[in-house]
Design a protein with these regions (language model features):
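The feature captures the LRR N-terminal capping module
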Residues: 1-45, 49-65
């Protein structure tokens, strides 16, 4: 599992899979910094009430859960 701190610090550049399951209440906008590489995004177990309208910016994303 990855941490929000790693994401915000830019330490996850180039990854293809991101696991931010559990403990989020808002969608981290920093995820868009990974748009060139991110294929799998795990947001399960979070208290997200919605996803951003511009989620389509993650053009390589194939799996979202």
């Amino acid at each position: 599992m990855h941490t929000l701190a790693q994401l915000r610090a830019g330490a996850l550049a180039g990854i293809t899979r991101l696991d931010l399951s559990d403990n989020l209440s808002e969608f981290p906008r920093e995820i868009f910094d990974l748009a060139d590489s991110l294929e799998v995004l795990n947001l399960s177990g979070n208290a997200l009430s919605s996803l951003p309208d511009d989620l389509h910016r993650l053009t390589r994303l194939r799996v979202l859960f």
